[in-house]
């Protein structure tokens, strides 16, 4: 899976892309002047980190099998802000949803987890946790054992969009 940014990303957006690439073992595409239409034509599964007011503000996960996009508005803390270090996941990755985020499990499996070669339903070393803040907000965090490794994403809205 490829991860990239909107054009002319800020340093904070590039840092988030690097953090996510290290955790999920994504390939980073330095977008440069590549138009979005060209990225979509390739039909490679991808994630685009978009900016709002100069900061990473939206994550779009493209699913070309269903011709849909999982779009999430977010705020975040980078790995260096959460754990003080850059964490590279070289092991198996799993997920854990609390009772209030359980309904999101199928979306994240369909759009993200089933496309990862290192994702396992059990016997994993690193866990992506989904936990509720309130009825409209939840966190996605990366844990190894009991330690939060970062990044920590606070998701405010989740929408399913059509790829046009």
From Swiss-Prot:
SMART domains associated with the record: Brix
Signal peptide feature range: none
Keywords recorded for this protein, A-Z: Ribosome biogenesis
Gene3D superfamilies found in the cross-reference section: Probable brix-domain ribosomal biogenesis protein
All residue ranges annotated as the Brix domain in the record: 1-164
GO biological process, one term: rRNA processing
Molecular function in Gene Ontology: rRNA binding
Role: Probably involved in the biogenesis of the ribosome.
Protein name: Probable Brix domain-containing ribosomal biogenesis protein
Protein source organism: Methanococcus maripaludis (strain DSM 14266 / JCM 13030 / NBRC 101832 / S2 / LL)
Lineage: Archaea, Methanobacteriati, Methanobacteriota, Methanomada group, Methanococci
């Amino acid at each position: 899976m490829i991860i990239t940014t909107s054009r002319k990303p800020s340093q904070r957006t590039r840092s988030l892309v690097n953090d996510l690439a290290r955790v999920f073992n994504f390939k980073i595409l330095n977008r440069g002047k590549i138009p979005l239409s060209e990225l979509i034509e390739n039909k490679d599964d991808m994630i685009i980190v978009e900016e709002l007011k100069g900061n990473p503000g939206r994550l779009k996960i493209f699913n070309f099998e269903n011709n849909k996009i999982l779009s999430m508005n977010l705020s975040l803390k980078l790995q260096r802000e959460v754990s003080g270090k850059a964490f590279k996941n070289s092991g198996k990755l799993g997920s854990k949803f609390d009772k209030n985020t359980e309904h999101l499990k199928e979306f994240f499996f369909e759009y993200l987890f089933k496309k990862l070669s290192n994702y396992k339903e059990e016997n994993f070393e690193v866990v992506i946790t989904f936990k509720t803040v309130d009825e409209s907000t939840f966190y996605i965090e990366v844990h190894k054992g009991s330690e939060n490794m970062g990044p920590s994403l606070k998701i405010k809205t989740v929408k399913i969009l059509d790829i046009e």
